[in-house]
Amino acid sequence: MPTSQTMEDLRADLARNIKQFRKLRGVSQERLALEAEVDRTVVSKIERCVGNPSLDTLVKLANRLDTTVSALMAPPLAEPA
């Protein structure tokens, strides 16, 4: 049975994943924004769980980070018990 997520959960997952993908690729917020053709404040807001990025923005960020929008929105894997 699927678990339901709140908007806050989704924003937190997105923030964590974008930051993680960005850091794994050694890219600053500014560089990511420049190469994805979005404003740097957009990346900052996403990583701070502020605002509501458009699908267009998510696609641009996912493309630059060599991943998918689904991966950016994915909840964390459950910790083994």
PLM ranges: what are they?
Residues P2-T3, M73-A81:
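Short, charged recognition helix plus adjacent turn
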Residues R16-E35:
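Short basic helix-loop element that most often maps to the first helix and adjoining turn
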Residues I18, Q29, R40, L55-L58:
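Helix-turn-helix DNA-binding elements, focusing on the entry/boundary residues of the two helices
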Residues E37-G51:
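Recognition helix of helix-turn-helix/homeodomain-like DNA-binding domains
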Residues D56-A71:
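DNA major-groove recognition helix of helix-turn-helix/homeodomain DNA-binding modules
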